[in-house]
Amino acid sequence: MALRTLRRARLNSLIERLDLFPLTSKFEKQEPLFLFARGLIFSSALIEEIRQDLPRRFSVCWGQIMTEDGMLSPEADIIIYEGSPYHEWKTEVMRFTLVPKDQVTVSIECCEYFRPTKHHKSHLNDLLRFTPKVFLFAECCWSKHKYQCKRARQSFLDMGFDDVFFLYKSYYGIDKEKEANDADWFRFLDAIRSL
């Protein structure tokens, strides 16, 4: 019971941190650069959370996966791997890593909206050439209804993602209340712990 309470508190804290840079609905205007920065904020916050549950033999980073002959994957939001990276660029505010393909356990793609697109499918296909598993973690399912989130989840799974998660449910209308998705959060942390 205490673990569930702690995990729920971490989920609520993560949602609060992301609220400093709120998502907008598809009906509101948003600058493209802001969307890119928003994605980095989400994936870096998720990396911080993963580190708390990740078994010690693993590392987690943002970067690209590299084969022995020098082929590079597309950029991966989150890579979980064992061993040492090929190279890592570290500054006070950023860390970008090149990870050997044979050391990768899972790659996690982050997105703001729980809405499948052709881009998700093509990016997934490109990543699967470099990683054994790919999870998708979306910030928000814009829906009042569980069945719409369930349908979106199934679409992502049908594309080939190994598992799919989202943080909260919200709706475009006047009531912008967020409904935290405890079930996915607990499942995600369990998946990380069981690597």
Predicted segments with their positions:
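Intrinsically disordered, low-complexity Ser/Thr/Pro/Gly-rich regulatory segments
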Residues: 1-76, 80-195
